[in-house]
Amino acid sequence: MSRFLLCSFALVLLYPTAIDLYLVGLPQIASDLNASESQLHIAFSVYLAGMATTMLFAGKIADSVGRKPIAVVGAMIFVLASFLGGMAEQPNTFLIARFCQGIGAGSCYVVAFAILRDTLDDERRAKVLSMLNGITCIIPVIAPVIGHLIMLKFPWPSLFTTMAGMGILVSVLAIFVLKESLPSQQGEEQTTPESHQETFFERFFISRLIITALGVTTILTFVNASPIVVMSMLGFDRGGYSSIMAGTAMISMLISFSAPLALGIFKQRTLMMTSQVLLACAAIVLSAAHFHDGQSHYYVFGLGLICAGFACGFGVAMSQALSPFSQQAGVASSLLGIAQVCSSAFYIWFMGFIGVSALNMLVFILVLGSVISLALILLIPKPVHDTHYEEIPSAT
């Protein structure tokens, strides 16, 4: 079991690392490639596009040929794309490399969640996903610091060499440590009643897909809006901003690592509702601080509530979304990932397009997400009568 957890954690970490590690090098990258920083900021959207376009195919193939081949191929694509990004001399080449990095990271991301669905029951999976969320929350803080330290001695291509090195490590784990977790009966004719009951159009899966998509949209809007709120509105410098973000990351980690203990005491539904209440409270605090000229610590408190709310319920919601699918976990993971990436990218783009301020953008998604998610949690509870929801198929 430990090998599955180790490999799943490593596969997931490629996704946030490739987003955050290179950001400190953007000014130098823009200078060397004769491009503006605003032009290179599109690399974030290109990276997400690469993830989204490959997720569905990766999940479907993983359900057919196995998790391990997709993990190995995805990690190798990530390695090659990272080397290409470091060697880029033109903006277009750089964007192509970022798109290909998204392909590799997206493949690994899908496989990681499919492996956890294959090998863990519902209760353990909820705990593991909560802990995994805590680990990924620290990447946005650690990665820029590591990138800064690297660039003190080396030029910006070394950032992509570091990403390639991480991809090589993941490739080694996928080849030599990871065992195939695809259910052994997956390659045979599916005639069992359970296999026919697995549909992606059921209310429960769609409700959890919406909840997780709104959650990721909220946290990515927070990441996108926080520099403007903290530095432009509140007047903090980069050092102050880094300290605040480090504090919010610590909150996310503490809540995420406490969630497994909480799940031993409270029901999953309780944690999910608590999560949405915290996000709604964050919207109230931020709005009150804005309209009543609140001091900076009120804003910081609101930002902390966002991280606490997301960390409290996201792992549980992801676990519940995957629970109906013992035979199609790869496709289920793909659909969840695509919904999360596309909803986040569209919301941030659309709000920017119509000229909504960063704070209003954040408050709106907090209100919208918490209201919709609370309604779905109350109206569509987790089924308790379907035994196949908790089926953990034997792995080959």
Curated annotation (Swiss-Prot):
Record's keyword annotation contains Amino-acid biosynthesis: no
Annotated GO CC locations: plasma membrane
Cystine connections: none
Membrane topology: Multi-pass membrane protein
PANTHER family, per the entry: MAJOR FACILITATOR SUPERFAMILY MULTIDRUG TRANSPORTER MFSC
Family: Belongs to the major facilitator superfamily. DHA1 family. MdtL (TC 2.A.1.2.22) subfamily.
NCBIfam families in the record: PRK10473.1
Name of the protein this chain belongs to: Multidrug resistance protein MdtL
Species: Vibrio parahaemolyticus serotype O3:K6 (strain RIMD 2210633)
Gene transcribed to yield this protein: mdtL
